[in-house]
């Protein structure tokens, strides 16, 4: 793997660890991280009560850049992976679920945008 790609991977893993810690501090259980499934990848899967959140994590120099860094195509891939993940976990059949985004930028707290995207609306 090229050095530039290794640095990006390391930064991504660090951002995901920070986001997972933030979710735990907010009372969520982190069920899984870096989940690769047919059709897509999910950065974090978290649970709070009877709600499952499929969380995309983005770290950029500015928070606004992180908030705009997920394309509609990426959300569709995340949604496909989420459907596969939920389909293999019947114990969560009665739970609600949503797609969240955690934006990270130097010098600021993580910004958790709940329900950042909904299938069929974009």
Swiss-Prot record:
It comes from the Bacteria. It holds the Pfam family UPF0102. Coiled coil: none annotated. Disulfide bonds: none annotated. Belongs to the UPF0102 family. HAMAP family: UPF0102. This is UPF0102 protein HNE_0764. It comes from Hyphomonas neptunium (strain ATCC 15444).
């Amino acid at each position: 793997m090229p050095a530039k790609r290794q640095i990006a991977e390391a930064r991504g893993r660090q951002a995901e660890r920070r986001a997972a810690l933030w979710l735990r501090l907010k009372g969520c259980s982190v069920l899984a991280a870096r989940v690769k499934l047919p059709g897509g990848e999910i950065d974090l899967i978290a649970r709070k009560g009877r709600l499952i959140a499929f969380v995309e994590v983005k770290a950029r120099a500015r928070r606004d850049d992180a908030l705009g860094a997920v394309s509609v195509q990426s959300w569709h891939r995340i949604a496909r992976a989420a459907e596969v993940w939920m389909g293999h976990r019947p114990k969560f059949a009665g739970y609600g679920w949503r797609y969240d985004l955690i934006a990270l930028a130097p010098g600021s707290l993580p910004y958790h945008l709940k329900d950042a995207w909904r299938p069929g609306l974009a």
